[in-house]
Regions:
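Transmembrane catalytic cores of multi-pass membrane glycosyltransferases
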Residues: 33-93, 98-100, 208-290
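Hydrophobic core segments of transmembrane alpha-helices in multi-pass, intramembrane catalytic enzymes
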Residues: 107, 162-174, 213-221
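Membrane-interface alpha helices of multi-pass inner-membrane proteins
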Residues: 191-208
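Start-transfer (signal-anchor) and selected internal transmembrane alpha helices
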Residues: 1-27
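Membrane-interfacial entry segments at the cytosolic side of transmembrane helices
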Residues: 10, 129, 187-192, 227-241
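Membrane-interface micro-motifs in multi-pass membrane enzymes
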Residues: 131-181, 207
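Juxtamembrane "helix-exit" motif on the non-cytosolic side of transmembrane helices
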Residues: 90, 119-122, 144-155, 249-257
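Transmembrane-helix motifs of polytopic, lipid-linked glycan transferases
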Residues: 104-129, 172
Length: 290
């Protein structure tokens, strides 16, 4: 009994220690955020919203401007509709003085989604939640402080929302899918299904890396459930269809062809080979193996 109590105390102390280290390590990042400012694509994607704000438009006008930006960009530049919507609402569109919120939004999304994802897994497995918190803190320390380009990960709205925010959405998405699978009450199933469908539509229209990986993982999970004859409800099929539909809508955008025409093309096979090659190169480079 005494040994168990000692172990629990140690786990609690470690969790508090790592949590404190994480919070203290965020201070320089938060201070730096007050010196950040909009750059490049921030201006182009938020021009319509900024125009509405300057002319005293209300919430409906702002949302209309955002959707118009999505439509225009979808037709003439890129198809990632959900990402473009987020781009159009960058903080400086309302005031350059609040651009620092970029860092707060990204850190909050990353921290909350990581904690939620790990906690969801530990709840299902029946493990000590404090150990899950410790693992979450370790993941966050590594994710935040060893990211290759901090300015694009946490300080630049266009870049950080495209990757950090949508990565956070994917963690939330898989967390909700797990909860949906194990939910017993109808009301919980309905709530989790609605959230999952919404996130599927958002992720399908996000950056292509996250959209593709999320689609592949979900397809693989469904395959495993079928293979092992586990219960698979119509809910998962609906979610997958929404995800893949959003992804396809994003890929077939006329704007993608317009943008591709400005670049030197290569065959699909060559593109895949280059993707795999540079994935290995950058993994080695970013992990210090090369």
């Amino acid at each position: 009994m005494q040994t168990k109590l000692d172990t629990k105390k140690i786990i609690t102390i470690v969790a508090i220690f790592l949590g404190t280290v994480l919070l203290l390590s965020l201070i320089p990042i938060i201070i730096s955020s007050f010196y950040s400012h909009p750059l490049a694509d921030d201006f182009g994607f938020s021009e319509k919203v900024n125009h509405v704000v300057k002319n005293g438009g209300g919430l409906f006008d702002i949302l209309s401007a955002s959707f118009q930006q999505v439509k225009d960009t979808y037709l003439d530049w890129q198809g990632t509709y959900a990402a473009i919507f987020v781009f159009s609402l960058q903080p400086a569109a309302f005031s350059e003085h609040i651009y620092f919120l970029t860092t707060f939004v990204m850190l909050t999304a990353l921290i909350a989604s990581t904690l939620f994802f790990v906690n969801t897994i530990f709840n299902i497995l029946g493990y000590d939640k404090k150990i899950g918190i410790i693992i979450s803190f370790v993941i966050l320390l590594l994710s935040i402080h060893f990211v290759v380009d901090k300015k694009e990960a946490f300080f630049w709205w266009n870049g950080s929302s495209y990757y950090t925010l949508f990565y956070s959405f994917s963690l939330l998405f898989f967390s909700i899918l797990i909860k949906l699978y194990y939910a017993e009450k109808i009301i919980k199933k309905v709530i989790f299904l609605i959230i999952s469908l919404l996130l599927a539509a958002i992720l399908g229209g996000g950056n292509y890396s996250t959209a593709l990986l999320t689609t592949v993982i979900l397809a693989f999970v469904i395959f495993l459930l079928i293979k092992h004859k586990k219960k698979i409800s119509l809910c998962y099929v609906m979610i997958f269809l929404i995800l893949i539909t959003g992804f396809v809508i994003s890929m077939i955008a006329p704007g993608n062809s317009v943008r591709a025409a400005t670049l030197t093309g290569e065959s699909p096979v060559k593109a895949i080979i280059h993707s795999v090659f540079y994935a290995v190169v950058y993994i080695a480079k970013w992990t210090g193996l090369a």
